Amino acid sequence: MDVPTSSTDSQEVKPIMPIRTKAACKFYPPHILCGKGAKTNKRGKRGGAQKASTKKDIGETTPPVAKKSKVAKEPTMLAAAAAPEAAASPESSAAAAAPEAAASPESSAAAAAPEAAASPESSAAAAAPEAAASLESSAAAAAPEAAAAPATPAAPEAAAAPEVAAAPATPAAPEATAAPAAPEAATTPAAPEAPAAAPAVEEEEMVWEAAAVVGEAAVKPPEEEPTSGEAVATTTMT
């Protein structure tokens, strides 16, 4: 009876020893398993390793918080930098539009003055209604094109309009050729500005009536006039 018990005790003790040294130390404190030898056990080293790992984890977790705060500050700096730019852009656009608006009536008036002075008012008064209707259609058709076109190319056209209008007015052919070229130069600077569009169109209609009277007196075919073709094309597109 004693021998089997001793054999069983020896069999039970053998598997407990490796568990005490390797696996059991992970789940039980060292003073229960190892007793006095707790100081020399690996548990202390593992505890130190765990403490170091916890410190590393703490060190790894803190920098992302600082990075998030920096990222949160960067959009505010970008927004603060974009605010003055956005505030300056309307001013620059308004400042750029102001000289154009100021120059467009002057250029249109300068282009209209020589034509009004050169056109004879006493010729063909019966053709005025037809000329007024054609001018209204051409001005209405040219308005969207002038609004879509940029303001920079309109400046050379406006500058070239007085030169074309200042041509010698003795023969009737130069006046007829200057009449179709003038509407584009006069409508383009006036159309981009909404407030100045209405009075400019009214003045242009008066000028084009006189120019159309001169063109009809010269009996020039409509195919040679570019404005008539453009007006028909734009009306069909609209």
From Swiss-Prot:
Residues 79-148 are annotated as: 4 X 15 AA tandem repeats of A-A-A-A-A-P-E-A-A-A-S-[PL]-E-S-S. Sequence repeats lie at residues 79-93, 94-108, 109-123, 124-138, 153-158, 171-176, 180-185, 189-194. Keywords: Cytoplasm, Nucleus, Repeat. One of its GO terms (cellular component) is nucleoplasm. Residues 35-238 are annotated as: Disordered. Residues 39-48 have a biased composition (Basic residues). Specifically expressed in testis (at protein level). The keyword Cytoplasm applies. It comes from the Eukaryota. This is Testis-specific gene A8 protein. The gene is Tsga8.
